[in-house]
């Protein structure tokens, strides 16, 4: 949201802070790094780079300390993170939105598709960042994550509201581009003239 409001430094600080809270935010940080590099925002690129290096050092120190305390038999589960959960797992992560959590899963699937359409049609710097973030997390969660990791959707599900709001305009643009919207309006106008006796 900070990037959408033109507050790049705040967005950078929030992204790096999120990374220190949860390593899953690394994907967002890499996306921001790539987008800022493509737009030649070198100060932001430097900020992302320094933040990710600081996190890598922090994580290495953490792993070295924890590694000496944890026995190899103390694993939480035997299966790996690569689960290929596909659309089912992705839709379950999309439900981690205050509105979608209480609705049936099929409705979450419809909202997810509409939100992706809205994100794809949002042609602005903020829209680009949102669309790439959604695409990256959805692609990742289609192959990575245990069924009990549904809560990972909290990373991206709040963004679905913004993209869903844009879906109405995106559907309108698609209808206009297809010519169907013009044909439908012409047909309705013709019916109105026939009914009016003109």
Residues covered by each model-derived region:
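Membrane-interface alpha helices of multi-pass inner-membrane proteins
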Residues: 1-2, 8-36
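Transmembrane-helix signature of polytopic, lipid-linked glycan biosynthesis machinery
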Residues: 134-151
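Transmembrane helix irregularities
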Residues: 3-6, 17-24, 57, 61, ...
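Membrane-embedded alpha-helical segments of multi-pass membrane proteins
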Residues: 21-26, 107-111, 156-163
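Membrane-lumen/periplasm interface segments of specific transmembrane helices
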Residues: 30-116, 127-134
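Hydrophobic/aromatic-rich transmembrane helices and adjacent perimembrane loops
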Residues: 149-169
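Hydrophobic membrane-targeting alpha-helices
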Residues: 2, 29, 33, 57, ...
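Membrane-interface junctions at the ends of membrane-embedded or membrane-associated helices
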Residues: 4-13, 36-44, 164-198
């Amino acid at each position: 949201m900070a990037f959408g409001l033109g507050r790049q430094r705040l967005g950078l600080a929030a992204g790096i802070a999120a990374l220190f809270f949860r390593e899953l935010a690394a994907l967002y940080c890499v996306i921001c790094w790539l987008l800022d590099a493509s737009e030649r925002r070198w100060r932001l690129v430097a900020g992302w780079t320094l933040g990710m290096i600081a996190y890598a050092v922090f994580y290495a120190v953490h792993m070295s300390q924890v590694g000496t305390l944890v026995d190899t038999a103390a694993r939480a589960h035997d299966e790996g993170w690569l689960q290929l959960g596909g659309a089912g797992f992705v839709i379950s992560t999309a439900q981690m939105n205050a509105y979608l959590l209480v609705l049936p899963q099929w409705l979450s699937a419809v909202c997810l598709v509409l939100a992706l359409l809205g994100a794809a049609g949002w042609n602005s710097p903020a829209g680009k960042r949102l669309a790439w973030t959604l695409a990256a997390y959805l692609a990742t969660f289609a192959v990575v994550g245990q069924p009990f990791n549904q809560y990972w959707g909290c990373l991206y599900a709040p963004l679905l509201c913004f993209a869903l709001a844009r879906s109405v305009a995106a559907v309108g643009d698609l209808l206009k581009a297809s010519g169907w919207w013009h044909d439908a309006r012409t047909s309705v106008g013709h019916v109105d003239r026939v009914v009016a006796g003109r």
